[in-house]
Amino acid sequence: MSSNFFDLNEIMTTKFPVSDELKEAVRVLRAGGVILYPTDTVWGIGCDATNHKSVERVFEIKRRPSSKSMIVLLDNMGKIPNYVEEMPDVAWDLVKYATEPLTVIYQKGKNLAPNVVGEDGSVAIRITHEEVSRSLCRMLCRPLVSTSANMSGQPSAATFGQISEEIKAAVDYIVPLRQNEHNTPSPSRIVKLYNDGVFKVIR
């Protein structure tokens, strides 16, 4: 079956956890909606990273300049070549052996909404190992936008309770999972990778 279509029966037979909450989130994403969901770092605002209009809404909700690109989540490193023009050999080791959330900026993105890709053509991708965001990526069969759940220029919301009511009211669906956790996660490490294999630590 093509990954461009959503078959609920097929998803229900997969071997990863599927809850009604996750199925509803995927329905919203497939319809072009925007969700609020937990990730491997802070809570995020997300949408289908291949849908230009959905990404545009995320920018509007955050009041973020469209010149600033956003991070894309995938559930499996084997999918990265589907969304970058070139993946240097060193990238595999960087991603495979990362001991904490790692966002890699690749020089040239592809098969993504144009407003996800940076003005220079680059794209920031992270492989998530967190259960909710990873399951959403698998079920959606597409990359997921991940940007912190705050207005542009404001501090990131480390916990669900710190997310503003304005943000909550602006999204189409709030994933009702992991909302009671109070640990303070750290943002991901960020590495900029060049096609010749040279990389630079940004954060």
Can you describe what each PLM-predicted range is?
Residues 2-203:
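Active-site-adjacent structural elements in enzyme catalytic cores
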